[in-house]
Amino acid sequence: MPKMKTKSGAAKRFLKTASGFKHKHAFKSHILTKMSTKRKRQLRGASLLHPSDVAKVERMLRVR
């Protein structure tokens, strides 16, 4: 039986770390002039995936 392929879109967006999955914040790509400086600052950097979404991402990346 052939190997299962990972979802390539998910592989580009999530990175497995020891403490979970790292991901970039949404709403930070274009048309940022309307957004306040505070909101843009809060969306900077990466964050860990919420525990309720971990099972879905593991299935997409075939981690288990």
UniProtKB/Swiss-Prot annotation:
Single GO MF descriptor: structural constituent of ribosome
Example of a GO biological process term: translation
Pfam families for the chain: Ribosomal_L35p
Database matches in InterPro entries: Ribosomal_bL35, Ribosomal_bL35-like, Ribosomal_bL35_CS, Ribosomal_bL35_sf
GO cellular component: cytosolic large ribosomal subunit
Keyword Ribonucleoprotein: yes
Keywords assigned by UniProt, alphabetized: Ribonucleoprotein, Ribosomal protein
UniProt-listed NCBIfam families: rpmI_bact (TIGR00001)
Similarity comment: Belongs to the bacterial ribosomal protein bL35 family.
Protein's name according to its UniProt entry: Large ribosomal subunit protein bL35
Organism for this UniProt entry: Pseudomonas putida (strain ATCC 47054 / DSM 6125 / CFBP 8728 / NCIMB 11950 / KT2440)
